Every structure is written in structure tokens, then in C-alpha cells.
């Protein structure tokens, strides 16, 4: 196959509809807009959510909640992710990034107790759950909150 032999799939590309080009085209005169009325006019569409003057649904519902500007979001690492590391090694935020376990650091890294830890590690993270701390110490490792 050569570059000049490439073709797009059948039906994947469509010619644009050319309107106002004579009555025999099927889209002449009113250009597919019907007769007179709001929708035949330029800019004659209502805004999104407009229900013809009836009280719109989004205004009938009460407002709820708020966005906390002080919210801290942590990158999450589970115990079974830490089995990648060698026995006795030190796990920090930097080593987690290097191994692809943490993509974005956000406000820090939190260790959660999902899974089973099979290696002895020294873990240095920003936050740790009680179950995760217990599991790391049961495996013979230590947890340090930085």
C-alpha cells in the first residue's frame, strides 16, 4: 500500500449541505428552515435549558453543598503496590514517582491498607491510614509521616 492509495472508509466523510442554491436542490429558498417563525430567523434559537417561560427544572431544585477551597487531595498508594520494591528498601514520594505509582503528587501521598504487604520497607509518606500502618509494621517495616 502506498500513500496515494489510501482512502477514507466508506460513509465516514460526508459533503457539507450547501443551502440556498435554487429550489431544485431541495434546500433552496428557505434553506431547510421551514416558513416564517422564530426558528426561521437569524439567531432564533433559545438558550440551553429554556422551557418556554415555564420555571425551568434547574431553578426548581434547591442549591446544595459547596466547594471547599481548603480541600487537600492526596495521591493514593495501596499496600499491594509496594510489593514492587526490594526487601529492606526505603520508599519515599520520589521513589513512588520514579516507579510510576504516583502520577501527580497533588497535596502529598497517602498510604492505604488495600492488599497485602509481603516485603519489609521503610515508608515515608505524607499521610497513612491506621490499617496500612499496622500492616507495614506487621511485615517488619516502619512508617514515617513527613
Swiss-Prot record:
Instruction: List the InterPro entries.
Output: Ribosomal_uL15, Ribosomal_uL15/eL18, Ribosomal_uL15/eL18_sf, Ribosomal_uL15_bac-type, Ribosomal_uL15_CS
- Establish whether keyword Ribonucleoprotein is in the entry: yes
Which PROSITE patterns does the entry mention?
RIBOSOMAL_L15 (PS00475)
Q: Name one GO molecular function term.
A: rRNA binding
Q: Which Pfam families match?
A: Ribosomal_L27A
UniProt keyword annotations, A-Z: Ribonucleoprotein, Ribosomal protein, RNA-binding, rRNA-binding
Q: Where is the composition biased (Basic and acidic residues)?
A: 1-13
> Carries keyword Ribosomal protein?
yes
Q: Which GO terms describe its biological process?
A: translation
- Bias (Gly residues): 23-35
- List the GO terms this entry assigns under cellular component, sorted alphabetically: cytosolic large ribosomal subunit
Task: Cite the residue spans of the region called Disordered.
Answer: 1-55
Q: Which family does it belong to?
A: Belongs to the universal ribosomal protein uL15 family.
What does it do?
Binds to the 23S rRNA.
HAMAP family given for it? Ribosomal_uL15 (MF_01341)
Self-association or partners: how does it assemble?
Part of the 50S ribosomal subunit.
Q: What is this protein called in UniProt?
A: Large ribosomal subunit protein uL15
Which source organism? Lactobacillus helveticus (strain DPC 4571)
